[in-house]
Amino acid sequence: MNSPSPMLPPASLDDDALAHALASGAAEVLLALRAEVDAAGGSFVAKEVKDAGDAAAQAWLAAALAAARPDDAVLSEEAKDDASRTRADRVWIIDPLDGTREFAERPDAEAPAGQWRDDFAVHVALWQRGAGLTAGAVALPARGQVLTTADGLVPGDDSAAVLAGDRPLRIAASRSRPPEFVAALAERPDVELVPMGSAGVKVLAVADGTVDAYVHGGGQYEWDSAAPVAVARSRGLVCTRLDGSELEYNRENPWLPDLFVCPPALAPRLRELLDTVGVASVVGVDSKEGAQP
């Protein structure tokens, strides 16, 4: 697939602006690839589109980071892990295409060429030694959105309505295979599951108020959550492990089993609900089997 690549961002950008430019550029690459599929008649093999998207976005991001921040280390889902990053002071943690399944799917079997699922994302985050996640951006290419750590706090959430019992607690969940404890929560009348695609889409759905929380225990990697967590924290959300412990990034093993994201006012209530379904049994699970973002 031969669409022209976006221009590489200049090295003069600060880290927040660079994260935005990187996520935006990779988003352009992915949308151009979809446009090529449609221009060729609209029929495609999903695996080929997934692989092409992963490869094209990774190649552009790698070139852009090498040009703009040549001395920084990189941890990417789509590149071989270089163990020397654990000794670096600055590490970019990226997922060039979060939600490959959604990227290569139409909304339904009858959808014509030009119509695609929109719940996939591009993740770009910067980790710095002694400071943790310091910059990040998440692009939702098909929705034309890029959210960054430079956006700042947003207006208050609707937590009061949940706490008062006026409406159920809305929890973002995997549309294909939610963790068992999340499915158990859905049996409660005061909880509503909202199925959606990639991990980035789920976390940002909490940030923009579409849902109240995202809790995950099926296993992820650092690139699945680093950028969404950076953006969510910049908007005042609680982002921790399920047991309340800190999320740690740029570890030797990038496996990060679980995630808890919600507004501060809802955190105590959500933790109480998780206790009722035995969530402690999944915290810290170290198996990579069955991971679903």
Go through each PLM region and give its residues.
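Solvent-exposed beta-strand sheet faces enriched in polar/charged residues
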Residues: 75-77, 125, 250
